[in-house]
């Protein structure tokens, strides 16, 4: 049985979720899909300039996982830009800031202050 998928933490949902080359009808374009977590990895590393270890900590993932996610995101963006493809940002398993994620239940012993269980 595979390990359960760990939710990634993001700070905001991208305001724009679709990019395409100008002047080409959408029906004629191939499309790359970038997950919301991949977009967050790009934002943290390339836009904010954080070190990978700090960016991974903010997303609640390991540094190797962050690096794989960043590589995948950069590949998809470069492929879309250089080959004239559309880019859709959607999907993924993530939590927005400190809101609960993935219907996962946290045992009361981990959320209650000491002496409150």
From Swiss-Prot:
A Pfam family assignment: DUF134
InterPro entries for this protein: RNA_pol_sigma_r3/r4-like, UPF0251, WH-like_DNA-bd_sf
Family indicated by similarity: Belongs to the UPF0251 family.
Protein name as it appears in the record: UPF0251 protein DET0218
